[in-house]
Amino acid sequence: MPTGCEFPMIKTFENALTAADFESTVELTNFPAVFRGCASVWDAYSKWNPFNSGLDYLEERAGSVEVEAMLSRTAPVFNGDIRSHERVSLPFSDFIRFCKQHMRGKGNGSGVDAKSADLNPMCEDYRPGQIYLAQFPILNDEKEEKVLLKILRQDIQTPTFLDAKSLSSINFWMNSAEARSSTHYDPHHNLLCVVSGRKKVVLWPPSASPSLYPMPIYGEASNHSSVGLENPNLSDYPRAEHSLKQSQEITLNAGDAVFIPEGWFHQVDSDELTVAVNFWWQSNYMSNMPEHMDSYYLRRITRSLLVSKPSSTDLRHLSEHIDQSRIEMAEGGNDNIGNESIKKGLSTLHEKASLHDLDPSASQALHDLISLVHDHVNAVDTSKGLQHTSPSCSEGGEKSKFLVNAMSCLEDDRVAHLLWNLEASRLRDVLLAMALELSYLKLLVKMEIFVLVLHKIFETLEALILHMLSPIAAEVLTQKFDEIDQQTGEEDRTQFFREFYSAFDDEAAAMDIILSRKEAFAFQVCSLASLCRLRTYHKLKGEKFSASY
């Protein structure tokens, strides 16, 4: 259904296309297309249907698999921004029981909020409608160890027009109650197939970006829109008034599929008990852009922007934008999300995490961190230094200090330098040991047990993250987190991050600080790139250019 779009109507194909026809008439145009009945020939079309014993089938086939789902406190809206949702692990069988509970509730008119007595105790903190099993891999060409639902692969078929494609991933999507995704784009071509239920998809071309206000490119959710589809705040986002004129809406019933080209914004509404599968693959354009050509393409793009000869007014607006962005970053403004602590279980990681069992290099790193942090703590008023406020409400001066130092050399930042030189596995053990000991100390305090301890050991983790983490150190820390992800099994990885963040009184604030300072680092990189563009432009015109930064 059109929604006032000024672009050609999205084509609908009732019959299957050949690979050649798909590439020439659909893919190369970078325009969406709908394929009716594309998935109706799959075994999954009948076997996964929740209203035809599909839930029993899925539970029998994969019930023991530990899946990772999105938890949204603002359900039915599920926002892809990492600050707006949590990732929770639970057995697939528990999620299936959520779905069965929803069906029973709808059947007797009692609603879906009642808790089920046979659910995992970890599930007690949320309602079934707050859980969305989103983007869980059936196939992944880079991370085979994360493909835990591969047993369902035999129930689906890759459409014939994708046979020649090198698929990067196939993902499973399922929701018990109605769900809405935030508006976003993906860096891959996408074929979204509805197996059961119904989805409504609103699509915008990349040219609609100004009306959708994408989040800052230096942020962790740069592919997401800042604007809600319904009732956007036009005082904050005046161009959003025109967004629907650039969009088209389609409805996918069971068996239907839609091709969503890379870069196209889309927002998806899913009916209750909808099951879907999507295929991601790299576009021909991106496949034909080898990395050794990146610098050349970047220069060509920059040159094409310069050829447009911006007016002096444009340049002034650009400079003002940089200054305003600098101020906004200094003032914070990131909303903290409610992030209740998940009940902790025992893991083999605990056995490695004792302060006394660290290997010599890890022990030395811990000693260096303690000395470094408490040299800093002793230099400030400790009555204030160990009190935390989130970046959104902290004083601008401290945030500005971090911003100014964002691009300092790695060697000049003692925290960043120490983190950089520490192997990811040892850093994991050090952080986990500190987190577990801090949690234990807080437990003793709550129990009013007085213990003579060296508080500096336990204070180090909070002081390090909440007060000493510069932007460049946050960038290094998150890179180390990525390495830990790659080197650690699923269960231990989940346990590590659970233990690490649960050591803080405000888990969401700790995560927000790490993300905010990582984004501050990326913001400075982007700002420097903008200044370089200005400098290059003036150089081409034979003019002098100076900027205080």
Swiss-Prot record:
InterPro entries: Cupin_8 (IPR041667), JmjC_dom (IPR003347). SMART domains: JmjC. The gene is JMJ31. Mostly expressed in leaves and inflorescences, and, to a lower extent, in roots, siliques and stems. The keyword Transmembrane does not apply. It comes from Arabidopsis thaliana. Keywords: Iron, Metal-binding, Nucleus, Oxidoreductase. May function as histone H3 lysine demethylase and be involved in regulation of gene expression. It is an enzyme of class 1 (oxidoreductase). It comes from the Eukaryota. Residues 125-296 form the JmjC domain. Belongs to the JARID1 histone demethylase family. Its main location: nucleus. This is Lysine-specific demethylase JMJ31. It is found in: Nucleus. Its EC number is 1.14.11.-. The keyword Secreted does not apply. Fe cation binds at H184, D186, H266. GO terms for cellular component: nucleus. PROSITE patterns: JMJC (PS51184). Its cofactor is Fe(2+). One of its GO terms (molecular function) is oxidoreductase activity. Binds 1 Fe(2+) ion per subunit.
